[in-house]
Regions:
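N-terminal/edge-of-domain interface segments
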Residues: 1-196
């Protein structure tokens, strides 16, 4: 008898930001997609089987696993908030490709010329790493890996991480600017409102 799945470590009280307009990479496959770029440009990707709970929590598109983009390869995209949030922490679900990688997220408020900016450095471990980077925990784990050329690697278990960075002081935020580093793949972003 299989053990029940481990609950996802979703950020308590976190407000999820909408990534849908910015998704530009398919990092989860439900079958071999030889022509796919995957997470590293060579086709390596999560096997979608076993990630259904994560897909639902992260709001993946209906056709995820079939080549539909499910994450954002960071190229400086701007995530607009529906309403301003006074944030006390930033949460990022994602992975790095090519080793542990850090990027600077910019929490902005105001117009482009007069905006107040709070920079938040987030480090994510590689999707094939066994251990998380600092300030991170395991978010989800696939049953196996689709390797270069669409080959199935059942001995490899790619992992998705959840990084949490508390701000030194609460910051008013109306938009979040992602880093410029396509080796960082973001599957989910949350802001935790300040409750003081």
């Amino acid at each position: 008898m299989n053990a029940p799945p481990t609950p996802l470590p979703l950020p308590a009280g976190g407000v999820a930001l909408d990534l849908a307009p910015h998704r530009n990479n398919a990092g989860c496959h439900s079958r071999s997609l030889i022509a796919a770029e995957g997470l590293d440009g060579f086709g390596r990707a999560f096997a979608a089987h076993g990630l259904q709970a994560a897909a639902a929590a992260l709001g993946f598109p209906e056709q995820w696993g079939e080549g539909e983009p499910d994450n954002v390869a960071c190229e400086g995209q701007t995530l607009e908030l529906a309403a301003p949030i006074k944030a006390s922490a930033l949460h990022v679900a994602g992975v790095a490709a090519g080793g542990s990688t850090a990027g600077v997220f910019r929490l902005c408020h105001g117009d482009a010329g007069t905006s107040a900016v709070t920079t938040v450095r987030v480090r994510l471990a590689d999707f094939l790493a066994r251990l998380p980077a600092e300030d991170s925990v395991l978010f989800a784990e696939a049953d196996f890996l689709y390797d270069i050329g669409g080959r199935t690697q059942r001995r490899a278990q790619p992992r998705m991480w959840l990084a949490t960075v508390s701000l030194p002081r609460p910051a008013l935020c109306t938009r979040v600017e992602l880093p410029v580093n396509p080796d960082l793949h973001v599957f989910g972003v949350w802001l935790r409102p300040d409750d003081t």
